[in-house]
């Protein structure tokens, strides 16, 4: 028997109230599958679903799901099942689920499947328990089969960000992974050691910093060092080079006489009037 979803307090969000904004270029485009949808419209629905769930503006060929696309084109599944399949795909597991903590996975999935952010840490904790007990597939099923999803998107509408007002779109402000996964990759490339851990431990000297750098990097750097005298390595060497270098004499005297300016007659205004002295 699954653990029931924990209760959590709600917070104020734009999507919880009706909007009276005038539609403009920021108004989301609604992609809906109907019985009369053409092949071009179905293609637009498929790519809109990829952008929404995978949050990628440029969909790679390896990210595509041909089996799900074929079923949707033949009306074997609806849009809601297509969204469910994308959430359960190996692409979503590798690119989103495995690169984030359960709390951040909940927040990202809510923005992509339900079109809103979570109501706070309490809701993230409640749904992270669902991930821990039912896995990723159970979590995706719970989102797609929820009453909130059905009321806002039904079976034939691609999810979208609901009532975005002045804020940037979710896919522009939320990178695919946070510092949690970036630091983990850093530790893997550094052979299990992290420069940040070395500094926190108090070893801020050269020995502590060198301990976080693989020995292969030092040998590689030494092998590509330029040969010959490098006067830019230290300030003293640079000053010595500048003080000892002999610059050629480039000054010369010009033999051309300077130009002379002769006075010229100027027609002053009103000189044609008799008796008017203009000089």
Swiss-Prot record:
Coiled-coil region: none
InterPro entries associated with the record: PBS_linker_dom (IPR001297), PBS_linker_sf (IPR038255), Phycobilisome (IPR016470)
Domain spans labelled PBS-linker: 11-189
Matches recorded under Gene3D superfamilies: Phycobilisome linker domain
Record bears the keyword Lipid biosynthesis: no
Membrane topology qualifier: Peripheral membrane protein
GO biological process annotation, one example: photosynthesis
Compartments where located: Cellular thylakoid membrane
Record keywords, A-Z: Antenna complex, Membrane, Photosynthesis, Phycobilisome, Thylakoid
Broad class of the protein's primary localization: membrane
One Gene Ontology cellular component: plasma membrane-derived thylakoid membrane
Domain of life: Bacteria
Quaternary structure and interacting proteins, as annotated: The phycobilisome is a hemidiscoidal structure that is composed of two distinct substructures: a core complex and a number of rods radiating from the core.
Annotated function: Rod-core linker protein required for attachment of phycocyanin to allophycocyanin in cores of phycobilisomes. Linker polypeptides determine the state of aggregation and the location of the disk-shaped phycobiliprotein units within the phycobilisome and modulate their spectroscopic properties in order to mediate a directed and optimal energy transfer.
Family note: Belongs to the phycobilisome linker protein family.
Name of the protein described by the UniProt record: Phycobilisome rod-core linker polypeptide CpcG1
Organism of this sequence: Mastigocladus laminosus
Gene (UniProt): cpcG1
């Amino acid at each position: 028997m699954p653990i029931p979803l924990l209760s959590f307090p709600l917070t104020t969000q734009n999507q919880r109230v009706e909007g009276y904004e005038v539609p403009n270029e920021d108004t989301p485009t609604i992609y809906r599958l109907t019985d009369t949808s053409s092949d071009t419209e179905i293609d637009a629905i498929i790519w809109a679903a990829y952008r929404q769930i995978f949050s990628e503006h440029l969909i790679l060929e390896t990210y595509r799901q041909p089996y799900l696309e074929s079923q949707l084109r033949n009306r074997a599944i609806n849009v809601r099942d297509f969204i469910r399949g994308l959430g359960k795909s190996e692409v979503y597991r590798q690119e989103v689920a495995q690169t984030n903590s359960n709390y951040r996975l909940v927040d990202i999935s809510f923005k992509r499947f339900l079109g809103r952010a979570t109501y706070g840490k309490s809701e993230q904790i409640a749904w992270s328990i669902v991930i821990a007990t039912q896995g990723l597939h159970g979590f995706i099923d719970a989102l797609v089969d929820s009453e909130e999803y059905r009321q806002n998107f039904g079976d034939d509408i691609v999810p979208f960000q609901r009532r975005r007002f002045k804020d940037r779109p979710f896919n522009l402000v939320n990178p695919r992974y946070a510092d949690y996964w970036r630091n983990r990759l850093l530790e893997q490339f550094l052979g299990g050691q992290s420069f940040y851990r070395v500094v926190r431990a108090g070893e801020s000297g050269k020995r502590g910093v060198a301990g976080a750098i693989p020995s292969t990097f030092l040998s590689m750097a030494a092998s590509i060092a330029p040969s010959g005298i490098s006067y830019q390595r230290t300030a003293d060497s640079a000053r010595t080079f500048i003080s000892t270098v002999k610059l050629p004499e480039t000054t010369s005297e010009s033999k051309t006489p300077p130009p002379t300016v002769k006075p010229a007659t100027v027609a002053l205004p009103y000189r044609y009037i008799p008796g008017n002295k203009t000089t």
